[in-house]
Each structure stands twice: as structure tokens, then as C-alpha cells.
């Protein structure tokens, strides 16, 4: 089958530079290497692949690679890794283009990506579904009332991913500066939520009508300087927080975490695969921090570690995601 792997490794394919750009993370940025790994995995299963940019030329590129079939049969699919170039709700841009063009693709719809992109909406949906999530407030000045919040608090952009801008604030006097940094650097509101001191657990999910919960991953933060998984802690620190998979969690709590994670997946309208990030407080009470509708697929990521612990190879995971998406569209899988 023809599979186009779409990512954003260059940020030049636009008509104008307009709107908030995707934050440029500290280098090296792994996106291009991940796309190459996905291409190789798809080729292992015999797929004809094309690696292309999720920019203004995408539909022209796809039409050449997978031209319309005269009998209206599917001419190919997209494995979507595109996180967007600029503007609002960037994760929705490529899926929206593909919806309009009639090209099937892996991962969440524009709706699903939009709901998870907006942390306020996703946390509200969680609460409405009975999923516990830390108390929070939205701020633009840092002088708003904090009467409903317990310090320390975590301050982060309302819409960004990859732990961009994540800050831990211990005292109300520090809050204004932290909020100002978010508003100035990222041109959006700051989400201020209560910090949950305890274990950090990531839960990888695969599927749709039936969702497979992969073995849980725990980040061992006890000996690590940073109490938060910031971008720097995850990707640039000399010693990164070690991960344990499967996490050592007693049976009753593990069942609760699985149920909470699937409920979050469904509340936020995710598809095919996602990752739910939780904290367990010192009493063992779980809180969902957020859900990632396009979790990282690098060979060192928590999602891939969970899949490999479940018995997948990297290739079988990538082709399994494609198979799940194909089954969602057409009622049958590719893998048989």
C-alpha cells in the first residue's frame, strides 16, 4: 500500500509568516529522525512510502503519489506525524487538509487534536466524565485570585505540547513573573494548576472501539533534580529520569488507572493511539495531567517502551497503528 509519512521538519512552506509559530525547541530536534524510523518500519512490511512535509504543498504532493482511483478505491493513506508550522491549533491543520481532500490518515481527527490541544477544554471534559485532574485557573497577568489553588502550582501554556514553558512556582509572589513569561513568549493564556507531588505514570493506548492499554511507564523522579518533566529534563539533561516499565502498581490501582485513561481517551475524542500522563499523590490518588493525541514515537519514548514491553517490535508497533487506522476507515485491517 502507498503510505505517505507527513511531518514538519522544515518550517518554510507557507504563504506568509503569520500567527504564533511552532516553538523552536532546543536542538537537536528529533522529529526528522522519528519520521525516518517510521518510514523504515513501514517499508519492512512492504509498503511503498513517501516522506513529505505538512505544508502548503502537501495536497499536490499527495495527489502525485496516490492519484485518485477511477473506481474510487483507496489509493493510499497518510501516517500523520505533523505538529504544524504556525497559527492556532496547529495539530489540527494537516488532518483538516486530509479530511477536505478525502485522504485517510492515522491518528486523531481535527476535533480530537483540537480538544487535547486546549488544556482547559480537555480538563473540563475530563471532569465532566468523572476523571480526576488537578484544580486549575487561567491567567493572563498572574495577579488574578489564587484563593482556589494550593501552592506549589505548575504554570504552562494553555495550548503547547512537549512540555514547552513548564514552570514550578512555590509562592504567590513568583506567579506574576511566570505567567508573564508564558503570555509574552507563547502569545496565549497561562494554565495554572496545582502541583501533584508524587509518582508520574504514563499510560499508552492503542485502538478505537476496543482500546488496548499497554504496560504503564513510571518516570523515576526521586533522584532527579527537576520535579517536573520539562523539555530540558526529558531531552537535554545529562542524566534523564529513568523509566520503569511495567510500573510497579498494585492490581486494584492499575485497574483504576486503566479505566481513567480509557475514559480520558474517549472524553477527548481521540483515535487510534494516545498517551495519558498522570500523577499519583502521596496517598495514591490519581490525577490526569493531560492527554497527548500524538505521542512521541522515537525509539526512546515512553509510548514505544510500553509497546516493546508488551511484546511489539518498533516495526510491529508502527504497522499496528496503521492497521488500527485502516480498520477504523474500512472495517478490516492490513495485517490480516
From Swiss-Prot:
Its taxonomic placement starts with: Bacteria, Pseudomonadati, Pseudomonadota, Alphaproteobacteria, Hyphomicrobiales
Highest taxon, organism lineage:
Bacteria
InterPro entries linked = ATP-grasp (IPR011761), ATP_grasp_subdomain_1 (IPR013815), Dala_Dala_lig_C (IPR011095), PreATP-grasp_dom_sf (IPR016185)
Instruction: Report the protein name in the record.
Output: Uncharacterized protein y4sG
What protein family is recorded? Belongs to the D-alanine--D-alanine ligase family.
Do you know which PANTHER family this protein is assigned to?
D-ALANINE--D-ALANINE LIGASE (PTHR23132), D-ALANINE--D-ALANINE LIGASE B (PTHR23132:SF23)
Organism for this UniProt entry: Sinorhizobium fredii (strain NBRC 101917 / NGR234)
**GO MF terms held by the record:** ATP binding; D-alanine-D-alanine ligase activity; metal ion binding
Gene3D superfamilies per UniProt? ATP-grasp fold, A domain, ATP-grasp fold, B domain
Q: List keywords of the entry alphabetically.
A: Cell wall biogenesis/degradation, Ligase, Plasmid
Q: Name one Pfam family in it.
A: Dala_Dala_lig_C
The ATP-grasp domain sits at 123-323
Question: Which GO BP terms apply?
Answer: cell wall organization
Q: Its biological function?
A: Could be involved in the biosynthesis of a cell wall component.
Amino acid at each position: 500500500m502507498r503510505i505517505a509519512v507527513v511531518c514538519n521538519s522544515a518550517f518554510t512552506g507557507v504563504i506568509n509568516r503569520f500567527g504564533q509559530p511552532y516553538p523552536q525547541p532546543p536542538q537537536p530536534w528529533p522529529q526528522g529522525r522519528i519520521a525516518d524510523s517510521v518510514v523504515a518500519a513501514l517499508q519492512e512490511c512492504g509498503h511503498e512510502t513517501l516522506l513529505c512535509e505538512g505544508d502548503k504543498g502537501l495536497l499536490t504532493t499527495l495527489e502525485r503519489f496516490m492519484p485518485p482511483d477511477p473506481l474510487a478505491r483507496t489509493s493510499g493513506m497518510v501516517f500523520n506525524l505533523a505538529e504544524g508550522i504556525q497559527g492556532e491549533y496547529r495539530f489540527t491543520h494537516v488532518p483538516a487538509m486530509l479530511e477536505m481532500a478525502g485522504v485517510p490518515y492515522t491518528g486523531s481527527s481535527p476535533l480530537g487534536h483540537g480538544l487535547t490541544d486546549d488544556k482547559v477544554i480537555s480538563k473540563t471534559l475530563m471532569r465532566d466524565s468523572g476523571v480526576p485532574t488537578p484544580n486549575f485557573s487561567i491567567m493572563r497577568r498572574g495577579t488574578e485570585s489564587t484563593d482556589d489553588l494550593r501552592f506549589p502550582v505548575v504554570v504552562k501554556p494553555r495550548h503547547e505540547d512537549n512540555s514547552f514553558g513548564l514552570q514550578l512556582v512555590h509562592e504567590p509572589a513568583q506567579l506574576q513573573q511566570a505567567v508573564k513569561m508564558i503570555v509574552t513568549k507563547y502569545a496565549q493564556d497561562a494554565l495554572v494548576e496545582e502541583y501533584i507531588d508524587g509518582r508520574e505514570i504514563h499510560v499508552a493506548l492503542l485502538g478505537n472501539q476496543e482500546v488496548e492499554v499497554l504496560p504503564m511507564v513510571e518516570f523515576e523522579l526521586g533522584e532527579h533534580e527537576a520535579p517536573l518533566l520539562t523539555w530540558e529534563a526529558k531531552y537535554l539533561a545529562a542524566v534523564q529520569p529513568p523509566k520503569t516499565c511495567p510500573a510497579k502498581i498494585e492490581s486494584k490501582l492499575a485497574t483504576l488507572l486503566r479505566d481513567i485513561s480509557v475514559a480520558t481517551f474517549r472524553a477527548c475524542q481521540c483515535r487510534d493511539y494516545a498517551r495519558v500522563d498522570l500523577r499519583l499523590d502521596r496517598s495514591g490518588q490519581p490525577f490526569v495531567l493531560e492527554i497527548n493525541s500524538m505521542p512521541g514515537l522515537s525509539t526512546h519514548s515512553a509510548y514505544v517502551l510500553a509497546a516493546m514491553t508488551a511484546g511489539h517490535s518498533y516495526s510491529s508497533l508502527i504497522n499496528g497503528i496503521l492497521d488500527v487506522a485502516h480498520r477504523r476507515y474500512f472495517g478490516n485491517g492490513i495485517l490480516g
